[in-house]
A protein has these predicted regions:
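Immediate N-terminus of the mature polypeptide
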Residues: 2-14, 20, 35-442, 446-498, ...
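Bacterial N-terminal signal peptides
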Residues: 21-33
Length: 594
């Protein structure tokens, strides 16, 4: 009931004179202001549970500095550095050694290790310089993803110029899960791919943590602990989890002119199917009148034992026209898709961390939708999409913020039978063919500003080698593209969208009212959106390009994991001629979950 009241409130906002629609204008240019042939899957996809990734905790440095005066000379001329695996391997009075010797010790990148320690040979060694040598060795190991190493200089006679150093690298001992309540310990420890008594590779372990933390119902971090045996290190997977079921309901005004702006939604997320951490998600979406749009969508995410991820997702949508002359005209579409994702090795340079993955898959889309293009419904239009997809994802984090990159390459061989042919595609968009290639790139940079302000820059670029069917075109207008315009007011084959957004520091309203248990956050937003698109091959009467631009303000408000509200109000700076010419509008989304 609360959702309905909130929806009514949202409609009241839109009924303000600043947001009141004017005369309805339907564009007749094919592909530029068309009703999308299939409801965008992202619009009706199940709402995600926000994940909280954790980083591995660095091992405590157990190596101790040499005490005493750092200027005290220990040896006038260092002739040899001998590295041994245990204190028991130190040889009293060792004299027959020269240069750098590794006795039963294996280091990562031996040539680089020699380059780190060999400059000390032939030098006068003080206590201070010896401490620098020890820290340089520890840093070398960490730079090579070996975080657990003890570098010990035992008591010895070094007047002969030979210095023996114990290099004790931690090996894998026990792997245990602690703190987990709803997920089994075996499920968590199986997500860490290490060999008993094997080396501890921090980069590989961070990849394992990322794999475990794909499940949004748990957060796992790694703590290194001394093992039972000398040289062993236990891996403690400290986990904070919650009951792996979330149900939610909400409202958005993300609909279109033909089927109504109101969208009511309800769904669930389940995060431990078969006790394997598999995720099952479902959402039902309907229009305000309950008949203009009815959509089912779902996804299944299966983390595989070898660290890859298999995902299936799909949707089924029924539509019915909401405005003259489209009243009663029905359409139907569905989609079945799959993706196989492979994480790539991450790398860490200084304080910059970069993580990436690649994925491949296939999309099948069926679209039978007579609510097409222009002022009058076309004859029944029917087309099938059969396309291969290659995806690249990258995330870079640094002290100043985060950069994300997502690239999707879509390839359709064409003429795969049924309604996957040039005749069907040309019927929904003049010049479109069933064989095509197009690429979509999305890049975003979040930069931390002074006083906890932040700046977000986001860009989307799409390019194609031919005219595309409506379901594959780049859409302009709506809360996640160019705000202030109707949802997918403009659709084109090629184009770009750019967003600049400034966000204030978050405010805890509950804290201000002395209700810290509320755990809420309020944030204000100011933004400028710009988009420009065109079709690959222009039809007679089509404009060369259609730019859109808007400025506005908004807010984001959350209460723990139970309530999420977004609200934006934007003013158009450029008119497309395709909308109802209201010049501005709001975009609102509300989700209640438990």
């Amino acid at each position: 009931m609360a959702i309905i009241d909130l929806a009514a409130f949202a409609r009241t906002i839109r009924s303000h004179p600043l947001a009141r629609p004017g005369t309805v204008v339907l564009a007749g240019w094919l592909g530029l202001a068309s009703l999308r042939g299939a409801e965008d899957f992202n619009r009706i996809a199940p709402k995600a549970v926000p994940a909280q990734p954790a980083d591995a905790t660095a091992a405590p440095n157990q190596s101790q500095k040499e005490s005493g005066d750092p200027r005290q000379v220990l040896v006038e001329n260092l002739k040899a550095l001998v590295f041994v695996p245990t204190p028991g391997a130190v040889s009293p009075g060792l004299v027959h050694a020269h240069g750098v010797e590794l006795r039963n010790v294996v280091t990562p990148a031996p040539d680089e290790f020699h380059a780190v320690v060999s400059p000390y040979l032939g030098e006068t060694v003080t206590r201070g310089k010896l401490n620098v040598l020890v820290q340089s060795i520890i840093l070398f190991y960490r730079q090579h993803n070996r975080p657990v190493v003890d570098v010990v200089v035992p008591a010895q006679d070094i007047t002969n110029g030979v210095l023996q150093i114990v290099l004790l690298e931690g090996r894998v001992g026990k792997v245990v899960a602690t703190g987990n309540r709803w997920f089994s310990s075996e499920e968590i420890t199986d997500g860490v791919f290490v060999q008993p008594n094997g080396p501890i590779d921090s980069r590989a372990l961070q990849g394992d943590l990322d794999f475990l933390n794909q499940n949004p119902f748990r957060t796992t971090q790694l703590i290194y602990r001394p093992g039972e045996k000398l040289g062993q290190t236990d891996l403690d997977l400290q986990t904070h989890d919650r009951f792996p079921l979330r149900v939610y309901a909400g409202y958005e005004d993300s609909g279109d002119l033909e089927t109504g702006e109101d969208r009511y939604l309800t769904g669930f997320n389940y995060g431990d199917l078969f006790g394997l951490g598999h995720q099952l998600n479902y959402q039902y979406t309907t229009s305000g009148n309950g008949t203009s749009l009815r959509a089912h969508s779902g996804s299944y995410v299966a983390p595989l034992p070898w660290g890859h991820t298999l995902t299936f997702f799909g949707s089924y949508v029924d539509t019915k026209g909401n405005i003259p002359p489209l009243i009663g005209i029905r359409g139907r579409s569905y989609q079945i898709s799959g993706r196989y994702s492979v994480p790539l090795p991450s790398f860490n340079v200084a304080s910059v961390v970069y993580k990436e993955s690649i994925a491949g898959g296939f999309d099948y889309k069926y679209n039978k939708d007579s609510l097409e293009f222009g002022n009058a419904p076309a004859a029944n239009t029917l087309y099938d999409v059969d396309q291969f997809v290659l995806t690249y994802n990258g995330v870079e984090t640094d002290p100043y913020g985060r950069t994300t990159l997502n690239e999707n390459l879509y390839v359709s061989p064409g003429d795969w039978g049924g309604n996957n042919n040039d005749l069907a595609f040309n019927g929904v968009h003049g010049g479109a063919t069933s064989g095509y290639v197009y690429n979509t790139l999305v890049a975003e940079r979040l930069t931390k500003l002074p006083a906890d302000w932040s700046l977000i820059l986001r860009g989307t670029v799409q390019s194609s080698n031919s005219n595309l069917a409506p379901s594959e075109q780049l859409g302009f207008g709506g809360y996640d593209t160019v705000r202030g315009y109707d949802e997918r007011e403009v659709n084109t084959d090629d184009g770009f969208i750019f967003t600049t957004e400034v966000r204030t520091p978050t405010i805890g309203v509950g804290d201000l009212m002395h209700y810290p248990w509320l755990k809420d956050q309020l944030q204000f937003v100011g933004f400028w959106d710009y988009g420009d698109g065109s079709n690959h091959i222009l039809l007679p009467g089509e404009p060369q390009e259609i730019p859109l631009s808007s400025v506005g303000v908004g807010l984001r408000y959350t209460i723990n994991t139970y309530l999420s509200i977004r609200y934006d109000y934007a003013f158009q700076l450029l008119r497309t001629g395709f909308d109802n010419d209201h010049g501005s509008r709001s975009d609102i989304g509300i989700v209640l979950s438990y």
